[in-house]
Curated annotation (Swiss-Prot):
UniProt site (Reversibly protonated during proton transport): E56
Main location: membrane
Keyword Cell membrane: yes
Subunit structure: F-type ATPases have 2 components, F(1) - the catalytic core - and F(0) - the membrane proton channel. F(1) has five subunits: alpha(3), beta(3), gamma(1), delta(1), epsilon(1). F(0) has three main subunits: a(1), b(2) and c(10-14). The alpha and beta chains form an alternating ring which encloses part of the gamma chain. F(1) is attached to F(0) by a central stalk formed by the gamma and epsilon chains, while a peripheral stalk is formed by the delta and b chains.
Gene expressing this chain: atpE
Protein name (record): ATP synthase subunit c
Organism: Geobacillus stearothermophilus
Domain of life where this protein originates: Bacteria
Amino acid sequence: MSLGVLAAAIAVGLGALGAGIANGLIVSRTIEGIARQPELRPVLQTTMFIGVALVEALPIIGVVFSFIYLGR
């Protein structure tokens, strides 16, 4: 096993860990906001879904870059 494979695995793993933590924080804050102001639920949910989509894009990009790096 080369160091490149190990580096790719660490990059993908840390990207997934960071995304998991960020998604938890995003959803937690959204629930707090909805509990405080229920009338803003549609706006908060839309913002939450956009935020979660952006956060989830980063680990996917990390996996793609890892495959590109390993393919060389």
